[in-house]
Amino acid sequence: MTLQEDIIRQLGVKAVIDPKQEIRQSVDFLKAYLLKHPFLKTYVLGISGGQDSSLAGKLAQMAIEELRAETGDEQYQFIAVRLPYGVQADEADAQKALAFIQPDQALTVNIKEAVDGQLRALETAGLEISDFNKGNIKARQRMISQYAIAGQTAGAVIGTDHAAENVTGFFTKFGDGGADILPLFRLTKRQGKALLKALKADPSLYEKVPTADLEDKKPGLADEVALGVSYQEIDDYLEGHTISAEAQARIEDWWHKGQHKRHLPITIFDDFWK
């Protein structure tokens, strides 16, 4: 088995999908998790205005609405959370996403004060924090807020990780990578776009240039620029196609570098890192 084949197997990627079937599978998955854990009543998800949170949010709202209809339990709720750092430049996109999702509840938690307070504390301790590191602090603070909300509402936190992010490790460890349930896992970037099209989302939600937008000095930095490889190449690789040797090497290098993000904290019994 080649490394490409092994990665495809581990991430559960299909070369061809039926978007409607994948929507149904994700909704049923989200419903089944709450039904299996009757002490949980809500899903919580941060909404950025990009493709991934728009899709995960819509799937979550669909699952919750079906659960309420099937059980008669009005405690089932989906809570969408806006988590800007100060003023978000593309706030209009986030509002479009909320209009598409139509969440039961929408909260806004501005993380700027918490992030800046953490930076001041670190600087007082004698550390100078890089802009890149600050970006990861933002991502982790967003998850702190989401888990605080989930803790108060008997909830579980949804993550937006999908196959194209997972293979490259393009997420913050214990930040956006720290969630309870991943309804998009197995899907490539273009497959996620196909699901949004099937859900009749506004094209702006899936045609927008993907960006983590974590660094102050590189606002709106495109994912593909940061990764040095295009989502088309990543998706082709994950769907089993042949791509350029250079792109394949870069993707597989990201895979190896990001292995620690896919595991629980390393124990003496682990050998994947050796």
Curated annotation (Swiss-Prot):
Binding residue positions for ATP: 46-53, 160, 189, 211
Reactions that this protein is recorded to catalyse: deamido-NAD(+) + NH4(+) + ATP = AMP + diphosphate + NAD(+) + H(+)
Any one GO MF annotation of this record: NAD+ synthase (glutamine-hydrolyzing) activity
Record-level GO cellular component terms: cytoplasm
Binding site for Mg(2+): 52, 165
Pathway field: Cofactor biosynthesis; NAD(+) biosynthesis; NAD(+) from deamido-NAD(+) (ammonia route): step 1/1
Organism domain of life: Bacteria
UniProt KW keywords: ATP-binding, Ligase, Magnesium, Metal-binding, NAD, Nucleotide-binding
A biological process term (GO) from this entry: NAD biosynthetic process
Binding site for deamido-NAD(+): 140, 173, 180, 260-261
One Pfam assignment: NAD_synthase
EC numbers on record: 6.3.1.5
HAMAP family, per database record: NadE_ammonia_dep
Homology family: Belongs to the NAD synthetase family.
Summary of subunit composition and partner proteins: Homodimer.
Cited function: Catalyzes the ATP-dependent amidation of deamido-NAD to form NAD. Uses ammonia as a nitrogen source.
Protein name, entry field: NH(3)-dependent NAD(+) synthetase
Lineage of producing organism: Bacteria, Bacillati, Bacillota, Bacilli, Lactobacillales
Protein encoded by which gene: nadE
